[in-house]
A protein has these predicted regions:
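Accessible peptide chain termini
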Residues: 1-2, 271
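Intrinsically disordered, low-complexity segments enriched in serine/proline and basic residues
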Residues: 4-12
Length: 298
């Protein structure tokens, strides 16, 4: 082969190699090119319609909150009173205290757990937005820090606000509930005159244990005409397709208004024995916010 022919061959081979390399790189780029971002769906755009940032020191805003009083539910040990809920340094604090004072509703030989207790050994608070702030559909969020010691039973939850429709027919959503080492996300409604529960449990040990409990976290309820999702720090905990509740007693409760409850319970049917726990126990809330799509904004 002459030098000229060899030179031509070398040059042609180089061109062929470059062409093959270009095709390979192009094909590889086509394979690894990121998927285009989805077009924004306007139905996923939320508008802030109500909030309580708890920035004013003193009692919670009476335009937003009222109180449960006394012994209320679940055979819990605490006596609910308004003075255990207060705002300080930009936080709502619901404080459970160990106290000892007479039960003003005590009745000798009573068979009712609320009135047969002669003494109050613990006090706390439960605040509720009933008749003040009620919503149908939306994104409900709370940023808070909870005490995970034995006996502590904090919750951020909703109940149905429809007059004359009682629990469980009115529905219940526990956006945040904690007791005995476990965070729960619960949804309940009435079916055949019994509460039908959808419950998801997450041990605090799996979330980070004591270190996790020292931080603030965001609990979310996303609710529209089709579904209800419960999230913790943006991660889905529980989900309900609302059609599943269409056969509920007195109709599907998840198409009707709800109100909020924030409370710090002690002991009772689920909270555990608080006798070895050092008080006070604090449920600290940074804010509660409600977002809605514009069609549902109130």
């Amino acid at each position: 082969m002459s030098k000229q022919t060899k030179s031509q061959w070398d040059f042609g081979g180089l061109l062929l190699f470059i062409a093959i390399l270009f095709l390979a790189v192009t094909a590889n780029c086509a394979e690894t090119k990121p998927e285009p971002l989805p077009v924004s769906d306007s139905t996923n755009d939320w508008k802030l319609v109500w909030q309580d940032e708890f920035n004013t020191n003193g009692p919670p805003d009476p335009a937003n909150w009222n109180y449960d009083r006394g012994f209320v539910r679940n055979q819990e040990l605490q006596w609910y009173q308004s003075e255990n809920a207060f705002c300080t340094n930009g936080l709502l604090v619901i404080e459970a205290r160990q106290e000892h004072k007479p039960n003003p509703t005590f009745v000798t030989n009573s068979t009712n757990w609320k009135t047969r207790r002669e003494w109050i050994d613990y006090t706390s608070a439960a605040i509720t937005s009933r008749r003040l702030r009620e919503f149908t559909y939306g994104r409900f969020e709370m940023r808070a820090r909870i005490d995970i010691r034995l006996g502590s039973w904090p919750a951020f939850w909703t109940l149905g606000a429809t007059p004359g429709v009682r629990w469980p027919a009115g529905g219940e959503v526990d956006v945040m509930e904690f007791y005995t080492g476990t965070v729960l996300a619960n949804i309940a409604y009435s079916l055949d005159r019994r509460a039908k529960w959808s419950t998801v449990k997450k041990p605090v040990a799996e979330l980070g244990g004591d270190a996790w409990s020292k931080e603030f976290h965001i609990w979310t309820m996303e609710w529209d005409e089709r579904k209800l999702d419960l999230l913790l720090d943006g991660r889905l905990m529980n989900h309900l397709d609302l059609v599943e509740a269409d056969n509920a007693d007195q109709g599907n409760p998840f198409h009707r208004p709800v109100y909020f409850i924030l409370n710090q319970a002690i002991g009772g049917t689920q909270g555990g024995d608080p006798s070895q726990t050092k008080f006070p126990i604090r449920f600290e809330v940074d804010w509660v916010r409600v977002y809605q799509h514009s069609v549902n904004s109130q």
